[in-house]
Curated annotation (Swiss-Prot):
Keyword set, alphabetical order: Cytoplasm, Methyltransferase, RNA-binding, rRNA processing, S-adenosyl-L-methionine, Transferase
Reaction(s) catalysed by this chain's protein: guanosine(2445) in 23S rRNA + S-adenosyl-L-methionine = N(2)-methylguanosine(2445) in 23S rRNA + S-adenosyl-L-homocysteine + H(+); guanosine(2069) in 23S rRNA + S-adenosyl-L-methionine = N(2)-methylguanosine(2069) in 23S rRNA + S-adenosyl-L-homocysteine + H(+)
Principal location listed in the UniProt entry: cytoplasm
Protein name: Ribosomal RNA large subunit methyltransferase K/L
Keyword Ribonucleoprotein part of the UniProt annotation: no
Domain THUMP: start-end pairs: 43-154
Length: 705
């Protein structure tokens, strides 16, 4: 009787135990990462040939205490290696674990190698060679606390390497994990299986091998036991011959059929080649097809299982498309696959919620470093089953706001407006429309909110937005807003360089929805820009902290004699120049100046009739000589502005500080009058957020308007 150990992916241990018991294993004991079991030589070989779930099969050789590197050396040398492999064979050591004495796994592997080599040298005067690539013998050492376990790896390469897959798609599943997913899916042998995002076909191939009774190890040519001196070649030949016969009979007997599709033609060709090498090509129909074109291949029956490992995405910008994909998949399941089972394996349970289906069972497993979940669904025979509208209250509010705002925006002649602004506390986002595009901005949740719950709500919001606005996923841009500090205020988010031309009260304005946190157009200042256009006819106009120069455009189109646009950012000034040019505002009368606005203002001597200034609430940029706080410093700012303001002129001063208090007494002492016009500058789409900005008109004393 051999004491053996089968390793597997975390989360698959109980499944592996059941599989080993079905092969005849005895004394099975589950531990984290594998199963200890016992069996004779026949069972040893059968576990290697037939286990679909094991990663490796190990034959323990010795276990001993390690309190120093000498203990490790002596414990390994105590094994009679000459009874395990001969001097002409190569070997390699795989060492995992550390303790206080062996702090580096590479050092541990080196000590083990030395012990094995010295063992041979003392007995034979010769030493075996070490081979890092495909060694004849692989020695596995696991060190945990003060105990080392030494084993012979009978597998050689990992058992997931069945021998049928040369190439894979971008994110392949290991074959033993794929077999586990199939085993847990609820699929019944003899029924059809569909994978609408099959990639290189691993799930379908593993299922077809199960259906046709094909041993997963049948195609492997190299094993860790080939050079083992106790290898029973005759028994192995008997078992592989039996497996060949079973595979041949199973292929003829199975009634299961498999259907796979993917939108990548190259990957489908790889899947076909893999299926041919696995010996199951005649059971699987592969085709190039987008998941949106998915149809039931057997609409008249029998019922089967849809199984897949859909993409889950790592980048924020990919999430709207993935949410739309899962929502579409859920609708397809309900409309075309009534009575079937659905089983999806994903690293994102939040995306699975976008199916709008209720899972009957779920399992956890690791896919490499990723924590994953497999959810099984029973699809109702009748069409239209639903788990209810996702984020129904958010969706209803969105519909209500749209009914009110769409007509208003059309009448006003604006393409860009806010549809939703954190109206409901649990959905803390802003939704802005830019023509046929939508930007969803998530306000970063407080640290007290569970991150997974916040992510789930965001996914629900995106899903509902796509549905309510009937929007293609590639027209939704997702951003996360949080307090910007230092260089992050101006840092690029992406490098797409995609600009869209929008219209606002007759002005054409360029926006960029993807590359920066802001889009180039502050929607809440829309009416202020219109007022500036009306105030500027025949006047010299100054725009400070100008951003992308949108106020300068309105002033120019309103008939300003000249416009001067000042900002510290070259990027934004180039953007402002584009905005002016597309509106025909070119020539020397439209100046663009790159400068620290506070320094330029403090040192300036030119005079202007209309000045617009929208400073940051706080700034400490390295390119500014000192920090700026709008509440603390606004009076000093007004002193400089007054010097540049012609008699009869007007300053429009706006800022975004909540609770801002204008120093009226200080202004009076400076010889300035102030009139708050915040209410007049707030439009219908910001009616719920009265504190988004405050706005003032200032004039020389005695010139009230």
């Amino acid at each position: 009787m051999n004491a053996l150990f089968a390793s597997t992916a975390r989360g698959l241990e109980e499944l592996l135990k059941s599989e080993l018991e079905s092969l005849g294993a005895q004394s099975c004991a589950v531990v984290q990462g594998g199963v200890h079991f016992e069996g004779d030589n026949r069972l040893l070989y059968q576990s290697l040939l037939w286990s679909r779930l094991a990663s490796r099969i190990l034959l323990p050789l010795n276990e001993f205490k390690v309190h120093s590197d000498l203990d490790l050396y002596l414990g390994v040398q105590a094994i009679d290696w000459s009874t395990i492999f001969s001097i002409d064979k190569t070997f390699a050591v795989h060492f995992t674990g550390t303790n206080e004495d062996i702090r580096n796994s590479q050092y541990g592997a080196l000590k083990v190698k030395d012990a094995i080599v010295d063992s041979f040298t003392r007995k034979t005067g010769q030493r075996p060679d070490v081979a890092k690539q495909q060694p004849d013998i692989r020695v596995n050492v696991f060190l945990q606390r003060d105990t080392a376990s030494v084993a012979l790896d009978l597998s050689g390469e990992g058992l997931h390497q069945r021998g049928y897959r040369d190439l894979a798609g971008l994110a392949p599943l290991k074959e033993n994990l794929a077999a586990a997913i199939v085993s847990r899916s609820g699929w019944q042998n003899g029924t059809p299986m569909v994978d609408p995002m099959c990639g290189s076909g691993t799930l379908l191939i593993e299922a077809a091998m199960i259906a046709s009774d094909r041993a997963p190890g049948l195609h492997r040519t190299h094993w860790g036991f080939n050079a083992w001196l106790k290898h029973d070649a005759e028994l192995w030949h008997e078992l592989t011959s039996e497996a060949q016969q079973r595979a041949s009979q199973g292929l003829q007997a199975t009634t299961s059929r498999f259907f796979g599709s993917d939108n990548d033609r190259r990957v489908i060709e790889i899947a076909k080649a893999n299926a041919r090498r696995a010996g199951v090509a005649e059971l699987i129909s592969f085709g190039v097809k987008d998941a949106a074109q998915l149809q039931n291949p057997l609409p008249e029956g029998p019922k089967g299982t849809v199984i897949s490992n859909p993409p889950y995405g790592e980048r924020l910008e990919s999430e709207p498309a993935l949410i739309a994909l899962h929502n579409m998949l859920g609708r397809k399941m309900k409309s075309d696959f009534g009575g079937w089972q659905l089983s999806l394996f994903s690293a994102s349970p939040e995306l699975l919620s976008c199916l709008q289906l209720r899972a009957e069972r779920q399992f956890k497993a690791k896919n490499g470093p990723l924590d994953c979940v497999q959810k099984n669904y029973q699809l109702a025979d009748t069409q239209g089953e639903s788990a209810g509208q996702i984020a129904e209250d958010f969706a209803n509010r969105l519909r209500k706001n749209l009914r009110k705002l769409e007509k208003w925006a059309k009448q006003q002649g604006i393409e860009c407006y806010r549809i939703y602004d954190a109206d409901l506390p649990e959905y803390n986002v802003a939704v802005d429309r830019y023509g046929s595009w939508v930007v969803v901005q998530e306000y970063a949740p407080p640290k007290t909110i569970d991150a997974q719950k916040a992510r789930q709500r965001l996914f629900d919001v995106i899903n509902a937005t796509l549905i309510v606005l009937e929007l293609p996923s590639n027209r939704l841009v997702l951003k996360t807003r949080e307090r910007q500090k230092g260089k992050n205020q101006y840092e690029k988010l992406a490098q797409k360089g995609d600009f869209l031309l929008m219209e606002e009260f007759g002005a054409k304005l360029w926006v960029n929805l993807t590359d920066y946190l802001d889009t180039g157009l502050f929607l809440d200042h829309r009416i202020a820009r219109k007022m500036l256009g009306e105030m500027s006819r025949g006047k010299d106009f100054l725009n400070l902290f100008a951003y992308t120069g949108t106020a300068s455009v309105h002033a120019g189109l309103g008939g300003a004699r000249s416009t001067t646009t000042v900002d510290m950012s070259r990027t934004y000034l180039e953007w402002a120049e584009k905005n002016l040019r597309v509106n025909g505002l070119t020539g020397r009368q439209h100046r663009l100046i790159q400068a620290d606005c506070l320094s330029w203002l403090h040192n300036g001597h030119e005079q202007f009739d209309v000045i617009f200034i929208d400073p940051p609430t706080f700034s400490n940029s390295k390119r500014m000589e000192e920090s700026f706080d709008v509440q603390r410093d606004h009076l000093a700012l007004m002193k400089d502005l007054k010097r540049l303001l012609r008699r009869g002129g007007t300053i429009m001063f706006s800022n975004n500080k909540r609770g801002f208090q204008m120093d009226i007494a200080g202004l009076t002492a400076l010889g300035l009058n102030a009139k708050e016009i915040t209410a007049q500058t707030q439009s219908q789409d910001f009616a719920r957020n009265r504190q988004i900005h405050n706005c003032w008109l200032l004039t020389h004393a005695g010139e009230e308007k």
